[in-house]
Amino acid sequence: MGLLLTALLQTAERFSVHLYEKRRDYTRTRMVQVASYLVADSVASYCTDYIDEESVQAVFDPQEITAGLAFRQSIPPDLMARLRGWAQGFCPLNAIERSLSDLIDARQSHPVRRSVAAVTAEDAMAMLAPGDILIDCTGSNSLLRDQLVPGAGAVDGSPNTFKIRLEYALVVTFLYGQAYDCNESCKYYKNIENAHYKFIPAVNRTYYDGSISHVTGIVSITAEDYERMPSRFDGHWLRSHFPHVAESMDRFIAKVKEETNGEIIGDLEIIRIPLDLYRARHATSREWRRTGTGDHPFIRSPVFLVGDSAMGSPYFQSISLGFECAMFLAGLLVQRDLPLPDMLDRYELYAYKQWLRVYMRSKMIKHNKDLLECVGDTVA
């Protein structure tokens, strides 16, 4: 997220951007997808998602969506071309990171200062000078999220984090060597023989080849199963230690192969995770400006949370949500005549509306998933 924000702000004459990265080698290979609404050119094409189309229309005014689309038109062509390419299908995360990093370095007329350092919250506060703007893109374990509430240091827990644990699950990912689609009916019929564990897939093409499909399957597990599993493993380990869980996965794969005569490319990648839905109650340092005392740096300099630092959902990859928040924030920052209090208010409202969208979408996906998991259960 920090790379995208840097690329968005880099060409703005009023900013001198300093990007801090924990590391410069991009090793995260998991497949992600940039949603098509990020490159939409009309309100109609923006509101095309079959799950949250109505939610978007209920939460956001048409004028808000139109303003976001207008900012997209100002995004430099070199960056927009990349976004359109990634929106074609799933892409390795580190390929996106490397592409953005190379783009930043290639813009010789607008150099960015880059530092590799493990920055702490105390470091971030100490380096803030009057006139600086600090943007936290450090992810779900945000560096500054719980520092945005005055007095948070004296409070146990996470005072600025609201979290709902929906369930525990296995997330199974693999590439399949044929174009494939799986709607709700497909998910239903492919799980009829699975008595307990259901394999609920999401399928889409890869961005580089429309004939290769990326499959992400979620299998709900118990808290006891979760504790007995390592954090990451492969299909062989699952079949050896949890054969009943593996059966649901293997049945799905076998039926897909039977229909299309394709094969899995490479290995299965499986992780076990708690599926948490969360948000920051305050997405900026506005509360410090309202109620803070003394000479705290967050009173002098604004702080914003972007991406997973601000909110996250387990059922769909949050890179698109983070990218959209980054675009909205960049659009605010380039407005020279926008007073800082108004900027903070507008970003807080936007973050809350995005949270409503995320919450409703996540609950709908969970509802649909729970219904599919009742397949074959004559008691439910």
Indicate residue ranges for each PLM-predicted region.
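Glycine-rich loop(s) and the adjacent beta-strand/alpha-helix scaffold that form part
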Residues: 148-186
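Flavin (primarily FAD) binding-site architecture
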Residues: 134-157, 226-235
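N-terminal Rossmann-like FAD-binding beta1-loop-alpha1 element of flavoenzymes
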Residues: 1-20
